[in-house]
Amino acid sequence: ELIGKGFKDDGKGGNARKGIVWVARRIPDGYVSAHANQARITTFPKDDPENCLYSPDVISFAREMGYYDGPDADFSFSDAYAPLDFGGMRACEARVWAFFRTVADDMDRYTDYAMGHNKNNRMPLWVKPRAKVSPKTLFDCMRDHYEGTPMDMTADLGAGGHNCPYRWRPMEFEVDGVKYVNERATATQQTGFWFVAQARPDVTRDMGILWFGVDDAATSCLTPIFCSAQEVPGCFREDNGSMLEYSPTSAFWLFNRVSNFAYMRYDMIAGDIRKVVDKWENEALRLVRDVDAEAMTLSPKARGKFLSEFSIATAQQLFDRWSKLDKY
């Protein structure tokens, strides 16, 4: 975790306070962690470089800025540089809680923390999952709307007649002098692209995968892009349309159109989309295993060409499949 030092005028129109302060902790083997725009590292070991590294001025700079005045041993990165408040818990840490709750046991004891009611009941930095977390499980964690929790976005009044798990901004609003809040779930409508990076120790270094998708994670799909790919698939190209310029060959615009259609009758449409998503992603995971076996027999140069062609072709197949869904 890191934060910039802010601006201090050097008298010449420049910044005399450059750089960042940071802490990095190694996640223990067999555990998982998560992060959602709120610092989570509190106290940390100062003499264990195998498992924790930090900038040399991480504590002294906090003292200089008046953020901390206690002993070094008790220094908490989050409490100094990003103190918890209601928004940090409800809009950020709640998303971490939703992930932890999906993969690990006994996370409901932190419900009051996730809802922003009890910052003293802070979640651990990492948790031990009940089973090995598969790529598909992680894909689906990105689609969460707090289903089955007190913050379930399909179940309150704002969901309307079709159980829509989205609340158009702002997140906070006031009625008759009373302030209310909309949830900020993991899956959200203002998504340009999303991905899951998969580092794999059982294949060569050029065979890592970026599972890549566009628009809302809950109503879109991931496709494998190998890290040795030498060309961007046409449907994902930066010059193929833009946020302000529609393109019929752009995956973003295609997925965005399907998602917006689903928002109107979510309970009737989202389930059909999810069937296509699950079928595609499960088949892609299986197909990657077959591709791995063939790629491992090739020279590095030939392998790069082979995996690049596979990534491009698969992305186009996804685009074609979504075009059919768009007309369904």
Residue spans of the language-model regions?
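C-terminus-biased signal that marks the final domain/tail of proteins
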Residues: 2-328
